[in-house]
Swiss-Prot record:
It comes from the Bacteria. Its EC number is 2.7.4.25. It catalyses: CMP + ATP = CDP + ADP; dCMP + ATP = dCDP + ADP. GO terms for molecular function: ATP binding; CMP kinase activity; dCMP kinase activity. This is Cytidylate kinase. Belongs to the cytidylate kinase family. Type 1 subfamily. It comes from Burkholderia cenocepacia (strain HI2424). Keywords: ATP-binding, Cytoplasm, Kinase, Nucleotide-binding, Transferase. Gene3D superfamilies: P-loop containing nucleotide triphosphate hydrolases.
Amino acid sequence: MKSTRPFHPTPVITIDGPTASGKGTVAALVAAHLGFHLLDSGALYRLAALASVRYGIAAEDIDALVKLIDDLHITFREGCAQLDGVDVSNDIRAEAVGNRASAIAVHGPVRTALVARQRAFRKTPGLVADGRDMGTVIFPDAVLKVFLTASAEARATRRHKQLMQKGFSANIDDLLRDLRERDARDSNRAAAPLKPAADAKLLDTSALSVDEAVDQVLQWYRALGQPA
């Protein structure tokens, strides 16, 4: 059946899913394989969250958050996330920052302030965008939409390993509880709740290696007649 999606000359692959489902790693490797640009939308939210904490802006102060986002100087360079010219890649991965990012994302105006920045990442030859609503809200015309899933236990284990490798202390039981609470909050929020697009490919990564997940995404992309 012929697609009814609006045509856009620059292809986008969206990879959505809950926290610690592996979407960031998979997206980065798919982008590297295809030579595409990469958008880590979660990093944008975390950068805004980190800045809000540093400037003393409450998670409920919507007007101040929107103004902050409009004024932020954000850049991504060689895998590093920079805020006001300073590499904060490790800072934004702290659990407290992740929880703040999820808390401010419930506000529609805050999300609107970041949408334009996310869409601006779409450049030739293509883009791989990872996040939570890339396929449903930001790039509804993406040529391939993938939604990664994994059990809460598997995701908590992955998150614990990531944090320990970065030098953060973490309790796996606390992480599991936080993940479940964040899943419930993100799935039930009024603005762009976490859910797969109707035409998304579902990929459970609980028992898959990173390479296996990447290979599956590339197979789906090739099946569309795209070079991969």
